[in-house]
């Protein structure tokens, strides 16, 4: 069932290079559509390379999706809503909020940088678009905890999540990117 906090795992034969082997955290789903962030698409860009002001901290950015790639978004893990205007997703997971307050919390050490992930862009679907893609078997819906979202090696997340699901999903985790090359 599609609800915020679920992940969407792209089928290995999706045929869309943007979402190839992606794991998308669903941050919102309603009658108007859905949006989320790709958790496993890191970039070589850093937060200070895209902001006009230089921050006192540095972190690599992730590609959140193909929409609004000139905008910065963020996810964070926090025991309670300490960041102003952050939106609760599930458990200890939130997205967005007051960026100035976020910078202060990180500088004070109230919020650890390891509990933040910054994204350029987001993944978005219009009304019924995601449901249509699910009918076409483009995505697998699964659960994930926030600890597994903030792994040090996100590039292997797609394969690791499928493998941990077992059964046929474990077999899918070994599906080649281009089976014609086998």
Swiss-Prot record:
It comes from Cytophaga hutchinsonii (strain ATCC 33406 / DSM 1761 / CIP 103989 / NBRC 15051 / NCIMB 9469 / D465). InterPro entries: AlgH-like. Belongs to the UPF0301 (AlgH) family. Disulfide bonds: none annotated. GO terms for cellular component: cytosol. This is UPF0301 protein CHU_1773. It holds the Pfam family DUF179. It comes from the Bacteria. Gene3D superfamilies: VC0467-like.
């Amino acid at each position: 069932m599609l609800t915020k906090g679920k992940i969407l795992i792209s089928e290995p034969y999706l045929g869309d290079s943007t979402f190839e082997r992606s794991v998308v955290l669903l941050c919102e789903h309603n009658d108007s559509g859905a949006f989320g962030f790709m958790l496993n698409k890191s970039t070589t860009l850093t937060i200070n390379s895209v902001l006009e002001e230089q921050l006192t901290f540095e972190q690599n950015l992730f590609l959140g999706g193909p929409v609004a790639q000139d905008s910065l978004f963020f996810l964070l893990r926090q025991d309670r809503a300490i960041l102003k205007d952050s939106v609760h997703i599930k458990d200890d997971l939130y997205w967005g909020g007051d960026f100035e307050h976020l910078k202060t919390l990180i500088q004070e050490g109230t919020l650890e940088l390891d509990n933040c992930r910054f994204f350029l862009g987001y993944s978005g679907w219009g009304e019924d678009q995601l449901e249509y893609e699910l009918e076409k078997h483009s995505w697998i819906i699964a659960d994930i905890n926030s600890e597994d979202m903030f792994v040090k090696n996100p590039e292997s997340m797609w394969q690791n999540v499928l493998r941990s699901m077992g059964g046929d999903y474990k077999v899918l985790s070994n599906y080649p990117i281009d089976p014609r090359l086998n």
